[in-house]
Protein backbone atom coordinates (compact mmCIF):
# COMPACT_ATOMS: atom_id res chain seq x y z
CA UNK A 1 0.00 0.00 0.00
CA UNK A 2 1.40 3.36 -1.10
CA UNK A 3 2.05 5.85 1.66
CA UNK A 4 0.21 9.11 1.11
CA UNK A 5 2.55 12.06 1.42
CA UNK A 6 1.59 15.18 3.31
CA UNK A 7 1.25 18.56 1.63
CA UNK A 8 4.57 19.68 3.11
CA UNK A 9 6.32 16.58 1.79
CA UNK A 10 4.87 17.14 -1.67
CA UNK A 11 6.13 20.73 -1.62
CA UNK A 12 9.64 19.62 -0.62
CA UNK A 13 9.67 17.01 -3.40
CA UNK A 14 8.46 19.59 -5.93
CA UNK A 15 11.18 22.05 -4.88
CA UNK A 16 13.82 19.35 -5.19
CA UNK A 17 12.63 18.35 -8.66
CA UNK A 18 12.47 21.94 -9.95
CA UNK A 19 15.93 22.78 -8.56
CA UNK A 20 17.31 19.67 -10.25
CA UNK A 21 15.79 20.76 -13.58
CA UNK A 22 17.26 24.26 -13.17
CA UNK A 23 20.69 22.68 -12.67
CA UNK A 24 20.46 20.35 -15.68
CA UNK A 25 18.71 22.45 -18.32
CA UNK A 26 19.49 25.80 -19.96
CA UNK A 27 16.52 25.96 -22.35
CA UNK A 28 12.90 26.41 -21.28
CA UNK A 29 9.67 26.95 -23.21
CA UNK A 30 6.93 28.85 -21.35
CA UNK A 31 3.50 27.54 -22.35
CA UNK A 32 -0.08 28.61 -21.57
CA UNK A 33 -2.23 25.62 -20.61
CA UNK A 34 -5.75 27.09 -20.74
CA UNK A 35 -8.46 24.45 -21.35
CA UNK A 36 -5.88 21.64 -21.52
CA UNK A 37 -7.09 18.48 -19.80
CA UNK A 38 -5.00 16.03 -17.77
CA UNK A 39 -5.25 13.28 -20.42
CA UNK A 40 -4.12 15.69 -23.13
CA UNK A 41 -1.22 16.84 -20.94
CA UNK A 42 -0.22 13.22 -20.38
CA UNK A 43 -0.10 12.63 -24.16
CA UNK A 44 2.14 15.69 -24.57
CA UNK A 45 4.50 14.35 -21.90
CA UNK A 46 4.70 11.02 -23.73
CA UNK A 47 5.41 12.75 -27.04
CA UNK A 48 8.25 14.80 -25.53
CA UNK A 49 9.75 11.96 -23.54
CA UNK A 50 13.47 11.60 -24.09
CA UNK A 51 14.84 15.13 -24.16
CA UNK A 52 12.09 17.30 -22.63
CA UNK A 53 10.15 17.48 -19.36
CA UNK A 54 6.85 19.30 -18.80
CA UNK A 55 6.44 20.83 -15.35
CA UNK A 56 3.16 22.30 -14.13
CA UNK A 57 2.51 23.92 -10.77
CA UNK A 58 1.44 26.99 -8.88
CA UNK A 59 3.16 30.17 -10.03
CA UNK A 60 3.95 31.26 -6.47
CA UNK A 61 5.63 27.93 -5.75
CA UNK A 62 7.71 28.08 -8.95
CA UNK A 63 8.74 31.70 -8.27
CA UNK A 64 9.83 30.88 -4.73
CA UNK A 65 11.85 27.88 -5.88
CA UNK A 66 13.60 29.88 -8.64
CA UNK A 67 14.50 32.61 -6.15
CA UNK A 68 15.85 30.10 -3.60
CA UNK A 69 17.86 28.35 -6.32
CA UNK A 70 19.35 31.69 -7.45
CA UNK A 71 20.34 32.56 -3.87
CA UNK A 72 21.92 29.15 -3.23
CA UNK A 73 23.81 28.78 -6.52
CA UNK A 74 24.49 32.41 -7.45
CA UNK A 75 22.98 31.74 -10.89
CA UNK A 76 20.66 34.69 -11.47
CA UNK A 77 19.82 33.86 -15.10
CA UNK A 78 16.61 31.97 -14.31
CA UNK A 79 15.23 35.05 -12.56
CA UNK A 80 14.28 36.18 -16.10
CA UNK A 81 11.46 33.62 -15.91
CA UNK A 82 9.78 35.32 -12.94
CA UNK A 83 7.79 37.99 -14.85
CA UNK A 84 6.55 35.34 -17.31
CA UNK A 85 4.83 33.23 -14.65
CA UNK A 86 1.38 34.76 -15.04
CA UNK A 87 -1.86 32.85 -15.52
CA UNK A 88 -2.16 29.13 -16.16
CA UNK A 89 1.34 28.44 -17.46
CA UNK A 90 3.75 25.53 -17.47
CA UNK A 91 7.46 25.09 -18.12
CA UNK A 92 8.93 22.75 -20.72
CA UNK A 93 12.58 22.04 -19.94
CA UNK A 94 14.41 20.69 -22.98
CA UNK A 95 17.83 19.68 -24.31
CA UNK A 96 16.52 19.34 -27.86
CA UNK A 97 16.06 21.80 -30.69
CA UNK A 98 13.66 24.51 -29.54
CA UNK A 99 11.84 24.74 -32.86
CA UNK A 100 11.34 20.97 -33.09
CA UNK A 101 10.02 20.82 -29.52
CA UNK A 102 7.54 23.62 -30.22
CA UNK A 103 6.34 21.81 -33.37
CA UNK A 104 5.94 18.57 -31.41
CA UNK A 105 3.84 20.32 -28.76
CA UNK A 106 1.60 21.83 -31.47
CA UNK A 107 0.70 18.32 -32.71
CA UNK A 108 -1.30 17.61 -29.58
CA UNK A 109 -4.07 20.15 -30.07
CA UNK A 110 -7.52 18.57 -29.80
CA UNK A 111 -10.91 19.77 -31.02
CA UNK A 112 -13.31 21.08 -28.42
CA UNK A 113 -17.01 22.01 -28.46
CA UNK A 114 -18.15 25.60 -28.03
CA UNK A 115 -19.29 25.55 -24.43
CA UNK A 116 -21.48 28.34 -23.06
CA UNK A 117 -19.47 31.20 -21.59
CA UNK A 118 -16.18 30.38 -23.33
CA UNK A 119 -14.34 33.22 -25.04
CA UNK A 120 -13.93 32.30 -28.71
CA UNK A 121 -10.22 32.06 -29.67
CA UNK A 122 -11.13 32.17 -33.38
CA UNK A 123 -13.98 33.26 -35.64
CA UNK A 124 -16.61 30.55 -36.06
CA UNK A 125 -18.24 30.35 -39.50
CA UNK A 126 -21.04 27.89 -40.26
CA UNK A 127 -20.67 26.71 -43.88
CA UNK A 128 -23.61 26.41 -46.29
CA UNK A 129 -25.04 22.99 -47.03
CA UNK A 130 -27.44 20.34 -45.82
CA UNK A 131 -27.51 20.03 -42.04
CA UNK A 132 -29.35 16.71 -41.87
CA UNK A 133 -31.79 18.22 -39.33
CA UNK A 134 -35.53 17.87 -39.79
CA UNK A 135 -37.73 20.97 -40.31
CA UNK A 136 -38.79 21.00 -36.64
CA UNK A 137 -35.29 22.24 -35.75
CA UNK A 138 -35.58 25.51 -37.70
CA UNK A 139 -36.13 27.52 -34.51
CA UNK A 140 -32.38 27.42 -33.74
CA UNK A 141 -31.60 28.95 -37.11
CA UNK A 142 -34.33 31.60 -36.84
CA UNK A 143 -33.06 32.79 -33.44
CA UNK A 144 -29.58 33.29 -34.91
CA UNK A 145 -30.86 34.85 -38.18
CA UNK A 146 -29.37 32.09 -40.32
CA UNK A 147 -31.06 31.89 -43.76
CA UNK A 148 -32.28 28.36 -44.48
CA UNK A 149 -34.56 26.39 -46.77
CA UNK A 150 -36.15 22.97 -46.64
CA UNK A 151 -34.60 20.58 -49.14
CA UNK A 152 -35.76 16.95 -49.36
CA UNK A 153 -37.19 17.04 -45.86
CA UNK A 154 -34.11 18.51 -44.16
CA UNK A 155 -32.88 21.99 -43.26
CA UNK A 156 -30.27 23.44 -45.60
CA UNK A 157 -28.16 26.53 -44.83
CA UNK A 158 -28.13 28.83 -47.87
CA UNK A 159 -25.09 31.04 -47.26
CA UNK A 160 -22.05 30.93 -44.93
CA UNK A 161 -22.74 32.65 -41.61
CA UNK A 162 -20.26 34.11 -39.12
CA UNK A 163 -21.79 32.72 -35.96
CA UNK A 164 -19.23 33.82 -33.35
CA UNK A 165 -16.50 36.44 -33.62
CA UNK A 166 -13.08 36.03 -32.06
CA UNK A 167 -13.09 37.39 -28.51
CA UNK A 168 -16.88 37.07 -28.05
CA UNK A 169 -18.42 34.80 -25.44
CA UNK A 170 -20.30 31.74 -26.65
CA UNK A 171 -24.05 32.03 -26.02
CA UNK A 172 -26.46 29.19 -25.27
CA UNK A 173 -28.09 29.33 -28.73
CA UNK A 174 -24.75 29.24 -30.56
CA UNK A 175 -23.52 26.38 -28.38
CA UNK A 176 -26.70 24.34 -28.92
CA UNK A 177 -26.68 24.84 -32.70
CA UNK A 178 -23.01 23.89 -33.09
CA UNK A 179 -23.60 20.79 -30.97
CA UNK A 180 -26.54 19.74 -33.18
CA UNK A 181 -24.42 20.27 -36.30
CA UNK A 182 -21.57 18.25 -34.80
CA UNK A 183 -19.13 21.15 -35.16
CA UNK A 184 -16.22 21.39 -32.70
CA UNK A 185 -14.88 24.81 -33.70
CA UNK A 186 -12.18 25.29 -31.09
CA UNK A 187 -8.90 23.47 -30.58
CA UNK A 188 -6.87 23.59 -27.41
CA UNK A 189 -3.34 22.65 -26.48
CA UNK A 190 -0.20 24.06 -24.91
CA UNK A 191 0.57 27.42 -26.55
CA UNK A 192 4.22 28.52 -26.43
CA UNK A 193 4.32 32.20 -25.47
CA UNK A 194 8.00 32.76 -24.60
CA UNK A 195 11.35 31.04 -25.02
CA UNK A 196 14.21 31.09 -22.50
CA UNK A 197 17.72 30.14 -23.59
CA UNK A 198 20.77 30.62 -21.34
CA UNK A 199 19.55 33.83 -19.73
CA UNK A 200 17.86 35.32 -22.81
CA UNK A 201 14.09 35.53 -23.25
CA UNK A 202 12.54 36.00 -26.68
CA UNK A 203 9.35 35.48 -28.66
CA UNK A 204 8.71 32.04 -30.23
CA UNK A 205 8.44 33.75 -33.65
CA UNK A 206 12.24 34.07 -33.55
CA UNK A 207 12.44 30.29 -33.99
CA UNK A 208 10.87 30.66 -37.45
CA UNK A 209 13.70 32.85 -38.75
CA UNK A 210 15.78 31.19 -41.49
CA UNK A 211 19.41 31.80 -42.45
CA UNK A 212 18.21 33.92 -45.38
CA UNK A 213 16.18 36.09 -42.98
CA UNK A 214 19.20 36.56 -40.73
CA UNK A 215 21.45 37.43 -43.68
CA UNK A 216 18.89 39.97 -44.91
CA UNK A 217 18.66 41.56 -41.46
CA UNK A 218 22.46 41.62 -41.15
CA UNK A 219 22.91 43.20 -44.59
CA UNK A 220 20.27 45.80 -43.75
CA UNK A 221 22.06 46.61 -40.48
CA UNK A 222 25.44 46.95 -42.21
CA UNK A 223 23.90 49.25 -44.81
CA UNK A 224 22.35 51.40 -42.07
CA UNK A 225 25.65 51.61 -40.16
CA UNK A 226 27.45 52.63 -43.35
CA UNK A 227 24.86 55.33 -44.09
CA UNK A 228 25.05 56.82 -40.60
CA UNK A 229 28.87 56.68 -40.61
CA UNK A 230 29.03 58.50 -43.94
CA UNK A 231 26.53 61.11 -42.78
CA UNK A 232 28.51 61.99 -39.64
CA UNK A 233 31.97 61.26 -41.16
CA UNK A 234 32.72 58.61 -38.54
CA UNK A 235 35.00 55.82 -39.83
CA UNK A 236 33.72 52.24 -39.54
CA UNK A 237 34.56 49.01 -41.38
CA UNK A 238 31.23 49.19 -43.24
CA UNK A 239 31.78 52.79 -44.34
CA UNK A 240 35.55 52.66 -45.01
CA UNK A 241 35.34 51.62 -48.72
CA UNK A 242 32.82 54.37 -49.44
CA UNK A 243 34.93 56.93 -47.56
CA UNK A 244 38.05 56.02 -49.56
CA UNK A 245 36.09 56.24 -52.80
CA UNK A 246 34.55 59.60 -51.89
CA UNK A 247 37.96 60.89 -50.81
CA UNK A 248 39.52 59.80 -54.10
CA UNK A 249 36.72 61.53 -56.03
CA UNK A 250 37.35 64.73 -54.08
CA UNK A 251 41.12 64.58 -54.76
CA UNK A 252 40.44 63.93 -58.45
CA UNK A 253 38.02 66.87 -58.62
CA UNK A 254 40.59 69.19 -57.02
CA UNK A 255 43.30 67.97 -59.43
CA UNK A 256 41.06 68.59 -62.44
CA UNK A 257 40.25 72.13 -61.30
CA UNK A 258 43.87 73.02 -60.44
CA UNK A 259 47.33 72.55 -61.91
CA UNK A 260 48.04 69.63 -59.60
CA UNK A 261 48.98 66.57 -61.61
CA UNK A 262 49.28 62.79 -61.20
CA UNK A 263 48.81 59.97 -63.79
CA UNK A 264 45.10 59.22 -63.27
CA UNK A 265 44.20 62.89 -63.10
CA UNK A 266 46.17 63.60 -66.30
CA UNK A 267 44.17 61.00 -68.18
CA UNK A 268 40.88 62.52 -67.02
CA UNK A 269 42.11 65.98 -68.01
CA UNK A 270 42.91 64.71 -71.53
CA UNK A 271 39.42 63.33 -71.94
CA UNK A 272 37.85 66.55 -70.66
CA UNK A 273 39.96 68.68 -73.05
CA UNK A 274 39.13 66.46 -76.03
CA UNK A 275 35.66 64.84 -75.57
CA UNK A 276 36.09 63.06 -78.93
CA UNK A 277 38.33 60.57 -77.14
CA UNK A 278 35.24 59.23 -75.39
CA UNK A 279 33.81 58.33 -78.80
CA UNK A 280 37.09 56.74 -79.90
CA UNK A 281 37.29 54.52 -76.82
CA UNK A 282 33.85 52.98 -77.42
CA UNK A 283 34.44 51.70 -81.01
CA UNK A 284 37.76 50.14 -79.94
CA UNK A 285 35.91 47.92 -77.49
CA UNK A 286 33.27 47.10 -80.11
CA UNK A 287 35.90 46.29 -82.78
CA UNK A 288 37.69 43.84 -80.48
CA UNK A 289 34.41 41.98 -80.01
CA UNK A 290 33.80 41.77 -83.76
CA UNK A 291 37.35 40.66 -84.61
CA UNK A 292 36.73 36.98 -83.96
CA UNK A 293 33.70 36.59 -86.32
CA UNK A 294 35.51 38.45 -89.14
CA UNK A 295 38.56 36.22 -88.75
CA UNK A 296 36.35 33.15 -88.98
CA UNK A 297 34.76 34.43 -92.20
CA UNK A 298 38.21 35.02 -93.75
CA UNK A 299 39.21 31.43 -92.98
CA UNK A 300 36.05 30.15 -94.70
CA UNK A 301 36.84 32.23 -97.78
CA UNK A 302 40.37 30.77 -97.90
CA UNK A 303 39.00 27.22 -97.80
CA UNK A 304 36.53 27.75 -100.68
CA UNK A 305 39.18 28.11 -103.49
CA UNK A 306 40.76 24.81 -102.41
CA UNK A 307 37.44 23.01 -103.00
CA UNK A 308 37.13 24.60 -106.48
CA UNK A 309 40.67 23.49 -107.44
CA UNK A 310 39.81 19.91 -106.49
CA UNK A 311 36.78 20.12 -108.75
CA UNK A 312 38.88 21.36 -111.69
CA UNK A 313 41.35 18.53 -111.16
CA UNK A 314 38.57 15.98 -111.37
CA UNK A 315 37.19 17.46 -114.63
CA UNK A 316 40.61 17.38 -116.32
CA UNK A 317 40.80 13.61 -115.88
CA UNK A 318 37.79 13.13 -118.18
CA UNK A 319 39.18 15.40 -120.91
Curated annotation (Swiss-Prot):
Keywords: Phosphoprotein, Ribonucleoprotein, Ribosomal protein. Residues 286-319 are annotated as: Disordered. Phosphorylated. Pfam families: Ribosomal_60s, Ribosomal_L10, RL10P_insert. Residues 286-295 have a biased composition (Low complexity). It comes from the Eukaryota. GO terms for cellular component: cytosolic large ribosomal subunit. Highly expressed in stems, inflorescences and immature seeds (at protein level). Expressed in leaves and mature seeds (at protein level). InterPro entries: Ribosomal_protein_uL10, Ribosomal_uL10, Ribosomal_uL10-like_insert, Ribosomal_uL10-like_insert_sf, Ribosomal_uL10-like_sf, uL10_eukaryotes. One of its GO terms (molecular function) is structural constituent of ribosome. GO terms for biological process: cytoplasmic translation; ribosome biogenesis. P0 forms a pentameric complex by interaction with dimers of P1 and P2. Interacts with NSF. Ribosomal protein P0 is the functional equivalent of E.coli protein L10. Belongs to the universal ribosomal protein uL10 family. This is Large ribosomal subunit protein uL10. It comes from Oryza sativa subsp. japonica (Rice).
